[in-house]
Amino acid sequence: MSETKTNLLDLDRDAMRAFFVELGEKPFRADQVMKWIYHFGCDDFDQMNNVNKVLRERLKAIAEIRAPEVSREQRSSDGTIKWALQVGGQEVETVYIPEEDRATLCVSSQVGCALECKFCSTAQQGFNRNLKVSEIIGQVWRAAKIVGGKRPITNVVMMGMGEPLLNLANVVPAMRLMMDDFGYGISKRRVTISTSGVVPALDMLGDQIDVALAISLHAPNDKLRSEIMPINDKYNIEEFLAGVRRYLGKSNANGGRVTVEYVLLDHINDDMQHAHELAKVLKDTPSKINLIPFNPFPGNPYGKPSNSRIDRFSKVLMEYGFTVIVRKTRGDDIDAACGQLVGEVIDRTKRTMKNRMQQDGISVKMV
């Protein structure tokens, strides 16, 4: 990529209009070009036949449309596709999950992750950097181009590699493009951001954009959560859920409820007492609960619970009146299931990041 060229995938609609106004063009040119990029998957200015030739030539000189390239593709027996995408010498993974009534894309927000959750393969790879807007929306662009068809992607979940709320400055514009009518036109109820509990950033998020929220809870008490999710030492369950309720108060995309993600680790957090504890801790936070049977990966001490343990846990929660879904494992034969995304983090700097988080607090850049 040329350093002197602007990658148009880095610009949401406001930024794109400002770009064209700076060129002396009318703002509607931005809308025209966005339709070519996102509706038609076009990355060649010469094909944009409703843009005059003089402007096309100028755009070729100063701009580009460059999405991450696929370095590897794996297709699961259940239809799931996992792509490893090149992002500046590193790799991130993106997963496409087709179902009868929808097609969901699981998108990464960082190269690696700094939060070190003990049950997640991504966390074991270390942390390198935040992804740029073009590298986030570019995952959607690349997947839509490969899959093809009229509505190749109906849902996007920011549940790939990384903690999205530690990259708000790039994640928010990318999500705007997902929902923009000149982008992918996906409903805000079908764009989901997931967080492990970066509470100050959750408050910022609610002031910036309205999307569906999922939270990675994974334990019903602070002692256990801190053991498996170190971020709990900084923002405990009570603080986290208070932040969630504040977000729900600002949001129309969630129907008043948050999705609680709870990975079931055999004989760690899946006892009946844990289910009762979870119901009690969530009593003031309107929730639907996604139970995720653990997906094993090499070198990890945790196991997947038996079906009977999963059923018992689920039934306890339903007795309290919660909507409970046991997530169907998809793509586990190609390591594309929840918690298995790795990519290739070449430069591991997670210790530096962890130290900085402990010393200075978790820093959040905002748009």
UniProtKB/Swiss-Prot annotation:
Binds 1 [4Fe-4S] cluster. The cluster is coordinated with 3 cysteines and an exchangeable S-adenosyl-L-methionine. Specifically methylates position 2 of adenine 2503 in 23S rRNA and position 2 of adenine 37 in tRNAs. m2A2503 modification seems to play a crucial role in the proofreading step occurring at the peptidyl transferase center and thus would serve to optimize ribosomal fidelity. GO terms for cellular component: cytoplasm. Coiled coil: none annotated. GO terms for molecular function: 4 iron, 4 sulfur cluster binding; metal ion binding; rRNA (adenine(2503)-C2-)-methyltransferase activity; rRNA binding; tRNA (adenine(37)-C2)-methyltransferase activity; tRNA binding. This is Dual-specificity RNA methyltransferase RlmN. The lineage of its organism: Bacteria, Pseudomonadati, Pseudomonadota, Gammaproteobacteria, Aeromonadales. Its cofactor is [4Fe-4S] cluster. [4Fe-4S] cluster binds at C113, C117, C120.
